């Protein structure tokens, strides 16, 4: 079967369908790239007509409504919620206090998450664990867990791949497949919280909790702390800095944030969730207008439009002046500072002149700069900025511009869990 919708061709074969641009239509491949923010020309998807609904997609109010519409007492929503986010159950069999009728209906229509652990890898120093998670449709994502003294941070993905194409980012190099649902985002956080209740990390070293805006596998040099962890550390922080661009998947990401902040569940406070964007201006402005309770981190990497566009292609769509205007609006509207991320690449953006350019760009803004030495990826031939260059950069920001900054120590690099390293080799 084949049909057209605009310039897009959809071909179906059994449970599979393929989407591509009609080569005969105006624009051809260029039109496809414009429509999909650079996704490959042909994509294959598999339909799963009988797939159950992911219970993690529901807010508590929606769960009450779901019960009511099935003539079940909505009071059970509170117990279901506590099973999911306090007891961290993996299936309906553990929900023993629910009436049999309620549990049977849940089992018939729902699933408790839809992620499978395909692989888990620990860093040599014991600070970091990376999970390769398989989704219901066969796609895969990566999630990272970091341990600190008495608490932990989860770095979660928001998309399968990424359409933004940052040249030094492994996720950008793999291309974009699809958005994650809110439930798939929430399930990553629940998985990390559940893992923390096991004995798997008893011998791991831990770090002090980082300030907002730091990615998985990273911490500042002055925060190393090798005390042993308590037996049941709590998931305290969540960073949307894994695979994907969160503001490209705004609705699902914000729904996930609302679910994760619910006081009756994981209860992650506003000061404990950080969202990192490459600079999707409409999303930043929407965050500001809605005054969403999250920290905002912006991947800056260059203070010159031409230089930034070479590293971050989306800067061609949302130029630096538009991005900075949006960040100013965000801070003025919300009263929050913005964390500006700067990947230090030797000879590219790590000189004293670059530091002063950043200082001038951010002058007068409530800001903090997070300096991140480049992490290796297969698709980018660059060298991390040297320690002395990072210190000089930081000193200039502090001395000449009174601009706070951190220099991150690289963590989880041996398992490709650092900033910019998350990727899945093959996607169906």
Swiss-Prot record:
UniProt enzyme class: transferase
UniProt-annotated catalytic positions: 142 (proton acceptor), 419 (s-methylcysteine intermediate)
Residue ranges with Basic and acidic residues bias: 207-228
Domain of life: Bacteria
Keyword set includes Transmembrane: no
Residues at which [4Fe-4S] cluster binds: 162, 166, 169
Location in or out of the cell: Cytoplasm
Region of interest (Disordered), residue spans: 207-232
Cysteines joined through disulfide linkages: 155-419
Residues annotated as binding S-adenosyl-L-methionine: 244-245, 276, 299-301, 375
MF annotations from Gene Ontology: 4 iron, 4 sulfur cluster binding; metal ion binding; rRNA (adenine(2503)-C2-)-methyltransferase activity; rRNA binding; tRNA (adenine(37)-C2)-methyltransferase activity; tRNA binding
Free-text comment on the cofactor: Binds 1 [4Fe-4S] cluster. The cluster is coordinated with 3 cysteines and an exchangeable S-adenosyl-L-methionine.
Miscellaneous: Reaction proceeds by a ping-pong mechanism involving intermediate methylation of a conserved cysteine residue.
Name of the protein described by the UniProt record: Probable dual-specificity RNA methyltransferase RlmN 2
Source organism: Opitutus terrae (strain DSM 11246 / JCM 15787 / PB90-1)
